[in-house]
């Protein structure tokens, strides 16, 4: 085996051992045994919410253990694979190299998962997208971003539940709220918070001029009962109205859409994608609780920043630029990570941006 290959495999082994140590594989196996015991209890489903938490945790833990065990098996098999390849010739060696490169990417992705250790990182994500400056192009851009995140979730087999979509009159959306349901989706997608900028030839301009558009992405953790985010009913004004679709046309004959206004904070939440008013109210309350949790977290962060004597983070600033004209490039302005294939990115191929963002955030946290 070539010395460079041997050195690379040794480096991969060191990285994987670190991953195994952080995950604490033996503790993970013990946790799976405990969850399997709970799942086998016939009385578990007497409390459906708790039962769903148990089965979800079990499924996630089993998948995590399976991934790290598969990586270990693949890495341990690499020396044998190269030994056989050297006997078979150049094509076999090329195949072994391809497997080694693929293994490196998979171990790096698993390493990134170990960096998601924040208080809420394991939660589902609640994503809010709002169009900014740029008129109809900005509304179209907001809808393109929503599709990008939904496609990313679909490619990974994650669930998506849309709570509200406010359509613009000509094209696109004014705003949208949806949940991405998968372990660590909040920790992963939270690096997407900020302003996303699009530069392109406007399809809505008869003169074919270049247009710059902006959209804001907000990512919140889905609230759980353990968060104790209690909302006083007297503090919430409830308005109902008919759901509307593109162009403002009504899509429901009953007042099923719900708007909640939290009077003390001025936070407004709408939900119209469910068929019944009750379902929309439940979903809207879930979003309101997530926003109130974020208010609480911001207050805590402000106190910590004051104690540390710094100005805090600048998540509200531009964080990524998508240029479709006069050249093709998507570039993260924080990490400097960039790709020259915007079409793939807008179709949900954003793992590279997410991984580089998570690594950047970890470095920033360590430096602060």
Swiss-Prot record:
Disulfide bonds: none
Entries under SUPFAM superfamilies matching the protein: Release factor
UniProt PTM comment: Methylated by PrmC. Methylation increases the termination efficiency of RF2.
Domain of life: Bacteria
Subcellular location: Cytoplasm
GO MF terms, alphabetically ordered: translation release factor activity, codon specific
Statement: the UniProt record of this protein carries the keyword Metal-binding: no
Purpose of the protein: Peptide chain release factor 2 directs the termination of translation in response to the peptide chain termination codons UGA and UAA.
Family affiliation: Belongs to the prokaryotic/mitochondrial release factor family.
Protein known as: Peptide chain release factor 2
Organism listed in the record: Rhodococcus jostii (strain RHA1)
């Amino acid at each position: 085996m070539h010395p460079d290959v041997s050195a690379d495999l040794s480096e991969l082994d060191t990285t994987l051992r670190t991953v195994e140590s952080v995950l604490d594989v033996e503790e993970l196996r013990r946790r799976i045994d405990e969850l399997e015991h709970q799942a086998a209890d016939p009385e578990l489903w007497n409390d459906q919410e708790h039962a769903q938490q148990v089965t979800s945790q079990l499924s996630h833990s089993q998948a995590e253990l399976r991934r790290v065990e598969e990586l270990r098996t693949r890495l341990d098999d690499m020396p044998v694979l190269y030994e056989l390849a050297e006997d078979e010739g150049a094509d076999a060696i090329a195949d072994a190299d391809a497997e080694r490169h693929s293994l490196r990417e998979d171990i790096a992705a698993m390493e990134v998962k170990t960096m998601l250790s924040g208080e809420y990182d394991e939660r589902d994500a609640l994503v809010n997208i709002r169009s900014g400056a740029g008129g109809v192009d900005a509304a179209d851009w907001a809808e393109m971003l929503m599709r990008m995140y939904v496609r990313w979730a679909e490619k990974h087999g994650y669930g998506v539940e849309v709570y509200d979509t406010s359509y613009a009159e000509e094209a696109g959306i004014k705003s949208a709220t949806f949940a991405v349901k998968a372990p660590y989706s909040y920790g992963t997608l939270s690096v997407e918070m900020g302003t996303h900028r699009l530069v392109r030839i406007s399809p809505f301009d008869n003169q074919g001029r270049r247009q710059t558009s902006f959209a804001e992405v907000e990512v919140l953790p889905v609230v759980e009962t353990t968060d104790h985010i209690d909302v006083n009913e007297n503090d919430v004004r409830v308005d109902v109205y008919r759901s509307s679709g593109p162009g403002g046309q009504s899509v429901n004959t009953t007042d099923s859409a719900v708007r909640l206004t939290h009077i003390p904070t001025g936070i407004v939440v709408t939900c119209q994608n469910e068929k019944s008013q009750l379902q929309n109210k439940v979903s809207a309350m879930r979003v309101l609780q997530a926003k109130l949790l974020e208010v609480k977290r911001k207050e805590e962060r402000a106190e910590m920043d004051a104690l540390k004597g710094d100005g805090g983070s600048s998540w509200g600033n531009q964080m990524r630029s998508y240029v479709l004209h006069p050249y093709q490039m998507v570039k993260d302005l924080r990490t400097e990570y960039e790709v020259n294939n915007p079409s793939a990115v807008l179709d949900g191929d954003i793992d590279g941006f997410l991984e580089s963002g998570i690594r950047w955030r970890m470095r920033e946290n360590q430096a602060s």
